[in-house]
Amino acid sequence: MNKLILIAMGLFTSIFSFAETNGKDVKIPEEKFVVIESSADGMPAIIVVNTSLRKFRHKELYGWTCSLVIKFKDMAINGMPTADESNYVFDYIEELDKTIKGDSIQPNAVYLARITWNGACEVIWQVKDPKVVHEYLGAIINNKTYPRELDYRIEFDKKWEKVSVYNKIKP
């Protein structure tokens, strides 16, 4: 039901020190979101993208993509959640976001996008230290403290190639 995929985390973390910036602090741009209404396979999709990361110059420091998928329980029509369900899940995502990011000045992750489509919500972060995120999300799953069925995966993507489509969206 909840599979965990963490690809070569230990190897890459030891080879590449993503938390290091040669003693310099990295300025994280203030989040700016654009909302896109789209469709896929005949079903509506709502995509929320943090466009401030488009020109972010330190992408390699956040070289891990964390994708979290939460399944909605209460559905309206066309695979979209009811307003109450949407609010409930998005409030939960906000709590996850705070913990996954950690420090607000030098966060462990940056919020890239959220996609609501076909009965689920996918949230994407770019992460510095995947071990911290894996331990946090793994504990939620192992302790069954999640309000809705969820799954996640963390993959190495130093150049953000797998999520490049989100950096091309214009406000």
Question: What residues fall within each predicted segment?
Answer:
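Short beta-strand
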Residues: 111-117
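Sec-dependent signal peptide recognition
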Residues: 2-8
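Charge-rich, low-complexity segments
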Residues: 20-98, 105-110, 131, 165
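Short amphipathic alpha-helices in soluble, non-transmembrane regions
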Residues: 136-144
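Hydrophobic h-region of N-terminal signal peptides that target proteins for export
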Residues: 10-17
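Conserved short beta-strand edge segments in small beta-sheet-based binding/regulatory domains
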Residues: 143-169
